[in-house]
Structure formats: structure tokens, C-alpha cells
């Protein structure tokens, strides 16, 4: 499987999971996201068609999440992304300071 196919499959799975977690049917999701044809949601969730970025934003909003969470590289990152998205400016400032003060060994490889 190519990288593109893996990314498409991951996004399709996350779109379906986010919709189900939001408690929406395919038809309800289409209405919430402003999509006139609900079968497009099915195509997104099956990986047959990738949503354009503006549509991905609309879907994320309808599902109560963010495009970043839907596109996260791995599932472990999703709770962190959600917490950052919900943080206020003071919390984000504290997080930035904490990240800046991480020892080099705990930072991303190659960032030294």
C-alpha cells in the first residue's frame, strides 16, 4: 500500500469514527456540514474520495473535532491535539514554555 493509500484509509476511518462519536447518521452529518448529497459522506468514509480541505473543516466542525485531529499521524496524538485545541491562551503560553524547556534528549530527533 502506498503512503497516499495509507493516509486516505486513515482519514476515512477517522471520519467515520468522528461521525459515530458525534452521534450523527450519515444524513445528519451531511446536513450539519452543509453537504447537499449525503452519499458524499459515504464516499469519504469508504476512502473512495478524499474531502477537500474546506470540506474537511466543515466535517470536523460538525463532528466537534478539528481537521488536525482527523489528520493526526497516529491515534496517540489525538487526545493531545484535542487538549491543545481546547486550551485557552494562558494554558497555551504555559505549554510553550514547558516545551521550550524540555531537555534536548526529550525533543524531537534532529532538533538539537
State each model region's role.
Residues 1-21:
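A short, Lys/Arg-rich alpha-helix, primarily the initiator
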Residues 13, 23-24, 36, 51-54:
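Residue-level signal for the short linker/turn that defines the boundary of a DNA-recognition helix
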Residues 16, 27, 57:
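Residues within the helices of the helix-turn-helix
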Residues 21-43:
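Short alpha-helical DNA-recognition segment
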Residues 44-45, 55, 71-74:
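DNA major-groove recognition helix of helix-turn-helix
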Residues 52-69:
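DNA major-groove recognition helix of helix-turn-helix/homeodomain DNA-binding modules
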Amino acid at each position: 500500500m502506498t503512503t497516499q493509500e495509507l493516509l486516505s484509509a486513515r482519514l476515512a476511518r477517522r471520519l467515520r469514527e468522528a461521525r459515530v462519536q458525534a452521534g450523527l447518521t450519515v444524513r445528519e452529518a451531511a446536513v450539519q456540514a452543509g453537504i447537499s448529497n449525503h452519499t458524499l459522506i459515504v464516499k469519504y468514509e469508504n476512502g473512495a474520495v478524499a474531502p477537500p480541505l474546506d470540506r474537511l473543516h466543515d466535517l470536523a466542525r460538525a463532528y466537534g473535532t478539528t481537521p488536525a485531529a482527523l489528520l493526526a499521524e497516529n491515534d496517540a496524538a489525538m487526545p493531545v491535539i484535542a487538549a491543545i485545541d481546547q486550551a485557552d491562551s494562558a494554558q497555551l503560553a504555559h505549554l510553550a514554555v514547558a516545551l521550550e524547556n524540555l531537555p534536548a534528549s526529550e525533543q524531537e530527533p534532529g532538533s538539537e
